[in-house]
Amino acid sequence: MENISKNAAANTVSAVHQLDPTKYVRITEKPGAKLKVLFVGNSITRHMPLPSIGWTGDWGMAASCEEKDYVHQTVRLLEEKLGEPVNFCVAQAAEWEVHYEEGEKPLLEYYIPARDYRADIVIIRIGENVNREKDKLNPCRGSLEKMVEFFASNPDARVIVTDNFWDIPQLNVQFEAAAKEHGWTFVKIGDLEKDERTMAKGLFWHEGVASHPSDYGMLKIAERLVEHIKV
């Protein structure tokens, strides 16, 4: 039996067609903002409406509204910490998870605007959709390192990498080792699923959607991230 949590196994949300490719990168700029934060993620970061699985939002899956997903809660908490507005960019990179073995090809095809954003802080919150069988034959760590290098185009960028929201040891060890080697900040969030309140169980009929972070879970992710952002 595969060594992953039951919630990871329950995630039957497809890794493909999570968002219209023309919307993979979205930049939000605010008057007077200086700091630029880039979020690189998957459905937990943003997923377009998909009524066939009971999802009607266009933000981090299972959050009740855009303001409650971890991206927007992170920005809000960071603005409170700084006392000023924050610009941010969202790169929905499930495409990388599916095609990581292709190197820069998917990155150059879809994510150049996020690279050229030259963020001050790059948050890598991704991994749940990496095919574990493929990863056994072709470990994703090298591709992860190249992906981070691609997005962290600002030489002074601070990089934050998290483990998986659902416990997937096979991937977590690679992410943590890469962070340690390159001096990235590694933030653990994988323990959050031990608290059922962090997931949207009972709020959606589709088990995969319901396994995604609830508003409370999104807040906890945001708090962990902001705790490690030194300003």
Place the predicted regions along the sequence by residue.
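Charged helix-capping and loop-helix junction motifs
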Residues: 105-106, 137-146
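N-terminal secretory targeting modules
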Residues: 1-40, 44-63, 76, 80-85, ...
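Active-site segments of SGNH/GDSL-like serine hydrolases
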Residues: 123-132, 145-177
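Second-shell loop/turn segments in exported
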Residues: 57-65, 133-137, 161-164, 207-211
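Alpha-helical structural signal in soluble globular domains
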Residues: 73-81, 146, 150, 154, ...
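Conserved beta-strand segments of alpha/beta enzyme cores
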Residues: 87-89, 158, 183-185
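Catalytic His-Asp segment of secreted/periplasmic serine-dependent ester chemistry enzymes
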Residues: 165-231
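Conserved SGNH/GDSL esterase-like catalytic core that processes O-acyl groups on lipids
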Residues: 23-24, 31, 36-38, 46-134
